[in-house]
Amino acid sequence: MISEVGPGASWKVGDRVCALLAGGGMAEEVVVDGRHVLPVPDGLSLAEAAALPEVYATVWLNLFQLAALKPGEKVLLHAGASGIGSAAIQLCKAFGNPCWVSVGSAERLAYCEALGAQGGVVRNGDLDSLNDLAPFDVILDPVGGSYAALNLKLLARDGRWVLIGLMGRREAQLDLAQVLAKRLHLLGSTLRNRDEQFKADLFSDLGQHVWPLFAEGRLSPQLARTFAIKDAEAAFAELATNKVSGKLVLVIDESLT
């Protein structure tokens, strides 16, 4: 909820909005560039809306801008039940891209399939069974090193491997012959340290291409649970269990949700 605006702002006090922040979001008030703000979609609570900007900006940037995903191309989403993964599944479904996932449990695989994933594998089982689902045109990967060699095998010719995290080691040994023979692209990507204009352009695209899909009922926030801000430590402890599907949100004022 906007409490103050600067000169020339297009927003007004009282507008229900959600925003992309570079940090500092666990606070009662934040200052944000008006170009990094979007309206809360009709029918959603503020808590639900808080779960949207970071994940949908990340997915749109990496799948649809950097990887230039085309309708019909196959996508593999590592950590498919995460906040980013759950947003990616929905966007893939909305834009005509069949997707598969790797996840941490059978329950999380079922969650992803209910959202629209075609299927996938549980990583504690046999990740190599992904070979039966390959080749993939695009892989969205927050894991990194431990999946690197597998990713090269799974990608189709001219495939794009978009690396957005390093949860599974920062170093890897790669067979560059596969990169050469299949003309593969490895794209490293970050969002938080991008400049203000880049984020403004990204949010303009989100407002045009993604936000209308909430009103159409084709996208929905995946809010696993809310915590009062005083219980932030408990929220981080739950996140650390690696059993959360979707997003956790800290709520400062219950009356505004």
Which residue stretches match the model-derived regions?
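Adenosine-nucleotide cofactor-binding segment
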Residues: L77, K93-Y147, K199-D201
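Short glycine-centered segments of the SAM/dcSAM-binding site in methyltransferase folds
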Residues: R16, K74, P98, G159-R160, ...
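C-terminal capping/lid region of NAD(P)-dependent oxidoreductase domains
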Residues: E216-Q222, E233-T257
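Glycine-rich beta-strand-centered segment in the early N-terminal region that forms part
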Residues: M1-G24
